[in-house]
Amino acid sequence: MAKVSMKNREQKREKLVAKYAAKRAELKAIIKNPNTSDDDRWDAQMKLQQLPRDSSPSRLRNRCQVTGRPHGVLRKFELSRIKLREYGMRGDVPGLTKASW
């Protein structure tokens, strides 16, 4: 189990990413536009750097919804490999069966 503070920190990051997504996309569009003047591009880069660090989507981490485990998380189920196996064996995940060939 991950510490509660780590789970809360991740939720805080998700909120910040959602809050600043439009602003970040707008600034990146200005920077990538080849018709933008150098001064405008420089201003956009400075504004982008002034945004909160945790508002960057690359700082997000996929975590297990049950335990908060950061490694071995399957995106489709949002569960760690351990919990997915446990739930699969109990029959809680529809369509998931143990392999046999």
Curated annotation (Swiss-Prot):
PROSITE patterns registered for this protein in UniProt: RIBOSOMAL_S14
GO molecular function terms listed in the Swiss-Prot or TrEMBL record: rRNA binding; structural constituent of ribosome
Alphabetic keyword roster: Ribonucleoprotein, Ribosomal protein, RNA-binding, rRNA-binding
Cited Pfam families: Ribosomal_S14
Matching Gene3D superfamilies: 1.10.287.1480
GO biological process, one term: translation
Entry's Gene Ontology cellular component terms: cytoplasm; small ribosomal subunit
SUPFAM superfamilies: Glucocorticoid receptor-like (DNA-binding domain)
Domain of life: Bacteria
Subunit structure: Part of the 30S ribosomal subunit. Contacts proteins S3 and S10.
HAMAP family assigned to the protein according to its UniProt record, in alphabetical order: Ribosomal_uS14_1
The protein's role, per its UniProt record: Binds 16S rRNA, required for the assembly of 30S particles and may also be responsible for determining the conformation of the 16S rRNA at the A site.
PANTHER family: 30S RIBOSOMAL PROTEIN S14 (PTHR19836), SMALL RIBOSOMAL SUBUNIT PROTEIN US14M (PTHR19836:SF19)
Homology family: Belongs to the universal ribosomal protein uS14 family.
Name the UniProt record assigns to this protein: Small ribosomal subunit protein uS14
High-level lineage: Bacteria, Pseudomonadati, Pseudomonadota, Gammaproteobacteria, Pseudomonadales
